[in-house]
A protein has these predicted regions:
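Short glycine/proline-centered loop/turn elements that form peptide/ligand docking sites
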Residues: 58-60, 71-82
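C-terminal "capping" alpha-helix adjacent to the active site of nucleotide-linked donor transferases
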Residues: 91-111
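A short, well-ordered alpha-helix in the C-terminal region of glycosyltransferases
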Residues: 108-123
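Acidic, glycine-centered active-site loop in nucleotide-sugar glycosyltransferases
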Residues: 83-89
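Nucleotide-sugar donor-binding catalytic core of glycosyltransferases
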Residues: 1-54, 73-78, 120-142
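Short alpha-helical segment that forms part of, or immediately flanks, the ligand-binding pocket
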Residues: 37, 60-66
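Conserved beta-strand scaffold positions in the cores of enzyme catalytic domains, especially
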Residues: 71, 89-91
Length: 144
């Protein structure tokens, strides 16, 4: 397990060892974008912890889809998207790890090619800039 948390200041770094187990490393040194991509490509599973200031998807979620990686997330809204598959995305309730072992042992479930195309960087740019052709990337319908 190679898990390092980047802290933005000395204060959060000082609290690190009170909060996390010793096998989770801490650093004040950011890694480059290229190194981050390399680490993602080498990983079997990506982690995504939702911040309290947003409810939407993080780039980590989209990266997991694009790199065909399993994802462990605290964002319950991910289950509302068309790329969600329980073999690929484990939604952690931050209380128990029920089903995590089975999730990690199960193979990645390939999604339809159209899903990978829809959430690709090229399609995202084309959609945002309204450059045809592109696939519309809509938000899930809210429950009424």
């Amino acid at each position: 397990l190679d898990f390092t948390i980047y802290h933005i200041d000395q204060g959060s770094l000082a609290l690190h060892h009170e909060t996390y187990p010793e096998n989770i490393k801490a650093t004040l040194q950011p890694i480059s974008f290229a190194e981050n991509i390399h680490r993602e490509q080498q990983s079997k599973v990506l982690l995504d912890f939702k911040t309290p200031i947003h409810t939407g998807l993080s780039f980590r979620t989209i990266e997991a889809v694009g790199y065909r990686k399993k994802l462990i997330t605290t964002n319950i809204h991910v289950a509302e998207y068309d790329f969600y598959h329980p073999d690929n995305i484990y939604i952690w309730d931050e209380k128990t790890f029920d089903g995590l072992d089975e999730f990690l042992e199960s193979p990645y479930h390939e999604l339809p090619a159209k899903i990978y195309q829809k959430y690709s960087f090229r399609n995202w740019v084309n959609y945002v800039l309204n450059i045809p052709p592109h696939i519309v990337i809509g938000l899930p319908e809210a429950d009424s």
